[in-house]
Design a protein with these regions (language model features):
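Short, flexible loop segments at boundaries between secondary-structure elements
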Residues: 61-94
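Short connector loops at secondary-structure junctions
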Residues: 1-19
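Short active-site-adjacent structural elements
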Residues: 48-53, 77-81
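A polyampholytic, Gly/Pro-enriched intrinsically disordered region
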Residues: 15-24, 84-103
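A short, acidic, amphipathic alpha-helical segment used as a generic capping/interface helix at domain edges
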Residues: 19-35, 50, 55-56
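Extended, charge-rich low-complexity interaction segments
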Residues: 26-39, 95-124, 141
Length: 141
């Protein structure tokens, strides 16, 4: 269970099918079907990327094992109430995170609507709408 995620070193380039099948068969499927896990956390960005992105590739090969994959810090930030889009950046993930976010008591749809409104303000050049972390804990802009 605790072996490599499949990213490895040179085989990610030279043996991509090995990497994909290893990730899907030895990690994602086992976590979902045997461990009944709701999420998989990793501290290595290579592991997060490999296990996250290989899920949509796996679907094209009829390996439909879906599992939210995120970095430990992303999960911790969500647990502390951070915005799933502005701060945690879940919109960049290929694995489905919506259900997990809802299980954590955060409305995915409301968060997405706020983020889309925020993007429109930024696109319009309203610089005061850019995220300023100091404002999150009572500082001044």
């Amino acid at each position: 269970w605790y072996d490599c995620c499949g990213f490895g070193f040179r085989h990610i380039i030279s043996e991509r099918e090995f990497t994909r099948s290893f990730t899907m068969d030895r990690k994602i499927r086992v976590a979902r079907e045997e461990a009944k896990a709701d999420v998989m956390l990793a501290n290595d960005t290579g592991c997060v990327t490999t296990m996250d992105k290989n899920q949509w590739i796996g679907r094209s090969h009829e390996q439909n094992f879906t599992m939210p994959i995120m970095a430990e810090v992303q999960f911790a930030a969500l647990a502390c109430g951070a915005d799933p889009f502005k701060i945690v950046q879940l919109q960049w993930h290929a694995s489905p995170c919506e259900e997990l976010v809802e299980q954590m008591g955060i409305s995915w749809d409301e968060s997405k609507q706020r983020f889309q409104a925020y993007l429109k303000e930024v696109e319009a050049g309203n610089i005061e709408h850019l995220y300023n972390p100091e404002l999150a804990y009572g500082g001044t802009a």
